[in-house]
């Protein structure tokens, strides 16, 4: 277990000399890394991450991506880091207007599919409006 702890802490950017320092000596960003390490080492069935890359350097972000891809069972990520999300995801769920859309793809492909879906919805709406106008005009003729 010690090797796993060391690997996780090193992956998140800590040096071996940091292992014996009290948590209170670390800045807020480094404390966030400590908490992230605690979560990852518990190996939960589901990990919920809110902006996990905010306090990480590039190497730590890459390590976290690799760790999550290879070790996590399920991850829900809320992030503005599009590259991180794109590299990590293989499923994107959109919740909008009371509906759930499930895309079994990465984030970039989801964006394309969402655009296509919205264009189809707009086209359908416009066709529906034309049909309503035609029916209304027909009814008005026979009043």
Label the predicted regions.
Residues 1-127:
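ABC ATP-binding cassette signature C-motif
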Residues 126-142:
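Short cytosolic helices in intracellular loops of multi-pass membrane proteins
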């Amino acid at each position: 277990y010690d090797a796993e702890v060391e690997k996780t802490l090193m992956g998140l950017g800590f040096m071996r000399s940091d292992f014996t320092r009290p948590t209170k000596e670390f800045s807020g960003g480094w404390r966030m890394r400590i908490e992230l390490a605690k979560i990852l080492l518990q190996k939960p069935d589901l990990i919920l991450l809110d902006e996990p890359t905010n306090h990480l350097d590039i190497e730590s972000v890459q390590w976290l991506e690799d760790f999550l891809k290879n070790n996590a069972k399920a991850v829900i990520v809320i992030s503005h880091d599009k590259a991180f999300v794109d590299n990590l995801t293989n499923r994107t769920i959109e919740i909008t207007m009371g509906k759930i859309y499930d895309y079994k793809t990465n984030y970039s492909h989801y964006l394309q599919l969402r655009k296509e879906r919205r264009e189809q919805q707009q086209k359908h709406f416009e066709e529906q409006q034309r049909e309503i106008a035609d029916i209304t005009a027909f009814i008005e003729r026979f009043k």
